[in-house]
């Protein structure tokens, strides 16, 4: 179990399963990045998880989070000064936060976390499936998740394939049941059209749709959808 529900053993104090990826990503850092600052763009919950883990372990971190999503950055204790924050102004969305983080990455003082392409991020999130399977005793028939980038669903699928290779928990593949928050549904629209490529989405309309949804963390306009190994 993930999130925060101590009665059933879930003790992630950020209340987000994104802690699973923050620990694995930070644990995989090596000397190559010594004296450099890790950069993470986020719509909110990933930033909260990385801020906690980096603060607790004194890992220099630069977060890029849309100004409208800053209320997602709550913590049970003050953060260490090694964690810094930049934000695109009011009216911007997650994609704008990514572009702002890319500007910082033009300096050799910073390095990118990597997002869905970082195997440590996917393997970290995959632990939710590994934990479920070892408790249930078999690979589930269905996997449900709300998605912004779809990285969690990709991670779940990769875990499923490894469990099949392991052989102790069955040989079937879960049906991934992923959802988005209307009216911001770019992956749903592409899937419905059976298109590997994301459909055209006007930037201004996308920002308006993001303002309307409740789940701001699901607002990735450029998800790893059509790439090889992506959600499609």
What kind of feature is each model-predicted range?
Residues 1-232:
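PLP-dependent amino-acid enzyme catalytic core
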């Amino acid at each position: 179990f993930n999130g925060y529900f101590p009665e059933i053993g879930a003790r992630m104090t950020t209340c987000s399963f994104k802690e699973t990826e923050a620990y694995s990503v930070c644990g995989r850092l090596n000397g190559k990045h010594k004296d450099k600052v890790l950069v993470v763009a986020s719509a909110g919950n990933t930033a909260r998880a990385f801020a906690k883990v980096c603060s607790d372990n004194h890992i220099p971190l630069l977060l890029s989070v849309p100004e409208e999503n800053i209320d997602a950055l709550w913590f049970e204790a003050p953060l260490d000064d090694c964690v810094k924050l930049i934000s695109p102004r009011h009216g911007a969305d997650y994609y704008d936060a990514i572009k702002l983080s890319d500007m910082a990455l033009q300096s050799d003082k910073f390095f990118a976390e990597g997002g869905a392409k970082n195997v440590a991020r996917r393997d970290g999130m995959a632990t939710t499936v590994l934990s479920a399977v070892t408790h249930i005793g078999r690979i589930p028939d269905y996997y449900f998740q709300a998605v912004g980038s779809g990285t969690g669903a990709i991670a779940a699928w990769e875990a499923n394939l490894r469990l099949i290779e392991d052989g102790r928990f069955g040989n079937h593949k879960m049906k991934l049941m992923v959802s988005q928050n209307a009216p911001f549904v770019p992956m749903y629209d592409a899937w419905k059209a059976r298109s590997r490529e994301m459909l055209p989405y006007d930037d201004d309309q996308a920002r308006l749709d993001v303002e309307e949804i409740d789940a701001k963390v699901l607002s990735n306009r450029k998800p790893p959808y059509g790439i090889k190994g992506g959600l499609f």
